[in-house]
Amino acid sequence: MEVPGLREGVGELMNLQDYYMTADLHEPPMMHQREFGIIRKDKGMWRHLAFSNMGKLRAFLIEQRPLHVYFSAAKYTDPGNLIMAEKGRLGADLIFDIDYDALKEPSLGEAAWQIKQLDKILAGRFGLKDRTMVFSGSRGYHIHVRDNCIQSLNRNERGQIAEDVMARGIEIDAPVTCDMSRLIRLPG
């Protein structure tokens, strides 16, 4: 049914604006050191954004009404710099991604079971304490590990952890774990 006087797409944009006004957005630790990116309808990815606090991020989201919001696993001295090599990486969280549609037994229940097993491995085998588990949007779960001991790990060291986890039967998306420049969906 057509709504009189409503142009195509306007209602959707207004709903996004309302959403960002009231959404319980997750504040990434050290957000002033994180790069942000958004996907806007019909405009693709816009990266290299930086915000000093949640109020400034929320105001930007209300104005821009993006479909998706992401933040970096890495922390930088200059997260808004357009040149990656000049951002000044300070360290990077270790991110694990389990998407249910990539599993041998594809179901959200299986993804939930695997993320719980992964959390036990990270705590028990690796002794990692600063872990946050989040629903990644609609396809599965992420675990963000922020312990100081992992911040300076390089791509190969992250890959070794990913291989260890996969050898224990956990079906993670290994490239996500290895990529220190990865942008991750902002929960909320």
Feature-to-residue mapping (PLM):
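Short, well-structured alpha-helical interface segments that form or flank functional binding sites
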Residues: 113, 138, 156, 178-181
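Eukaryotic intrinsically disordered and solvent-exposed regulatory patches
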Residues: 81-82, 128-129, 170-172
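Helical (often loop-to-helix) elements that flank the catalytic cores of nucleotide-handling enzymes
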Residues: 3, 9, 13, 44-50, ...
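DNA replication initiation on ssDNA origins
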Residues: 1-94, 98-109, 179-188
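Generic hydrophobic, aliphatic-rich segments that mediate packing or membrane embedding
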Residues: 67, 90-94, 111-114, 118, ...
